[in-house]
């Protein structure tokens, strides 16, 4: 067998459709474009948002103003798992970090979870809390109980 004897497997290659090459081919004369009209002409194409004459979607919807237009919002905003100060009382230990919160079922098990401690509820023992963010009220309640709020 030589390279010039190789050919692709039968059915793996489709022949190009040759249009405008005589009536007997089935694609002569109008080349599969029908009779007249915009789609029968060369060099014309309806723009992508054209909806056949009805009012297009981008014109039916109102224009958004200000920050809602998306200029000032980040593409991927940070999403925090919220944990209230009152829920920390159920977690054992002097130091409460992400592993302890996961074990208690207060946050998702994903490794890249961001945690924010919020100020709802009370805590009555001094604990060191490690999280990505704290609300002002949460930080004040933790420190008032004699604990520390450490930002990761």
From Swiss-Prot:
Q: Which GO terms describe its molecular function?
A: rRNA binding; structural constituent of ribosome
Report residue spans for region: Disordered: 1-79
Q: What is this protein called?
A: Large ribosomal subunit protein uL15
Q: Which gene encodes it?
A: rplO
In terms of SUPFAM superfamilies, this protein maps to: Ribosomal proteins L15p and L18e (SSF52080)
Which family does this protein fall into?
Answer: Belongs to the universal ribosomal protein uL15 family.
InterPro entries registered for this protein in UniProt: Ribosomal_uL15, Ribosomal_uL15/eL18, Ribosomal_uL15/eL18_sf, Ribosomal_uL15_bac-type, Ribosomal_uL15_CS
What this chain does, per the entry, is described as: Binds to the 23S rRNA.
Q: How does it assemble?
A: Part of the 50S ribosomal subunit.
Which species is this UniProt entry from? Rubrobacter xylanophilus (strain DSM 9941 / JCM 11954 / NBRC 16129 / PRD-1)
